């Protein structure tokens, strides 16, 4: 079948040269597109690919840097937590030590106050015993003078009698106390 003999209607060339010129023009246009347009498109595609690839690489680098920074901050945070725990433990131990020292000081002060109070009580007791002995001695001498009917003016003899009387009184209550304790 011959192309020229086909019924192409309005598309049918009037002269066979038109087909040759058409084919040459199509080949020329194809060559022109291949030499001028395609390299530009390829260049644009390559630039676009490089831009995208560079963006991806930059994003990956940024992500890696962010991950490294996150790990660094997490390590610093863990270190800070450990340090805070250490400081808290030190503060607790120092607080316990301070409390122990304050208790010891308070106990020493309480012991000193108790000792001072006991000494003062003992001094007051001794003073009261001396005063009571002197008064009892005077009363005993007066009573003895009335009973005997004579004046007991010899101080040494009076003092010896009073001391003997008081020591017998001192022995009696402790003996009666021991009897009371044994009964209980």
Swiss-Prot record:
InterPro entries: ATP_synth_B-like_membr_sf (IPR028987), ATP_synth_b/b'su_bac/chlpt (IPR002146), ATP_synth_F0_bsu_bac (IPR005864), ATP_synthase_B_chain (IPR050059). One of its GO terms (molecular function) is proton-transporting ATPase activity, rotational mechanism. Keywords: ATP synthesis, Cell membrane, CF(0), Hydrogen ion transport, Ion transport, Membrane, Transmembrane, Transmembrane helix, Transport. It comes from the Bacteria. GO terms for cellular component: plasma membrane; proton-transporting ATP synthase complex. Its main location: membrane. It is found in: Cell membrane. F(1)F(0) ATP synthase produces ATP from ADP in the presence of a proton or sodium gradient. F-type ATPases consist of two structural domains, F(1) containing the extramembraneous catalytic core and F(0) containing the membrane proton channel, linked together by a central stalk and a peripheral stalk. During catalysis, ATP synthesis in the catalytic domain of F(1) is coupled via a rotary mechanism of the central stalk subunits to proton translocation. Belongs to the ATPase B chain family. F-type ATPases have 2 components, F(1) - the catalytic core - and F(0) - the membrane proton channel. F(1) has five subunits: alpha(3), beta(3), gamma(1), delta(1), epsilon(1). F(0) has three main subunits: a(1), b(2) and c(10-14). The alpha and beta chains form an alternating ring which encloses part of the gamma chain. F(1) is attached to F(0) by a central stalk formed by the gamma and epsilon chains, while a peripheral stalk is formed by the delta and b chains. This is ATP synthase subunit b.
């Amino acid at each position: 079948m011959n192309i020229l003999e086909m019924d192409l209607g309005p598309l049918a060339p009037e002269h066979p040269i038109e087909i040759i010129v058409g084919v040459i023009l199509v080949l020329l246009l194809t060559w022109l597109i291949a030499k001028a347009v395609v390299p530009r498109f390829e260049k644009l595609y390559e630039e676009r690919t490089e831009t995208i690839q560079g963006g991806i690489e930059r994003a990956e680098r940024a992500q890696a840097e962010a991950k490294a920074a996150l790990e660094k901050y997490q390590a610093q945070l863990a270190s800070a937590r450990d340090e805070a725990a250490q400081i808290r433990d030190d503060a607790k131990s120092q607080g316990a030590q301070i409390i122990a020292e304050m208790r010891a000081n308070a106990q020493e002060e309480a012991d000193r106050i108790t000792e001072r109070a006991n000494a003062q009580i003992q001094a007051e007791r001794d003073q009261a015993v001396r005063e009571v002995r002197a008064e009892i001695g005077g009363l005993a001498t007066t009573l003895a003078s009335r009973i005997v009917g004579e004046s007991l003016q010899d101080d040494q003899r009076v003092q010896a009698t009073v001391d003997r009387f008081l020591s017998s009184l001192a022995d009696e209550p402790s003996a009666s106390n021991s009897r009371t304790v044994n009964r209980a």
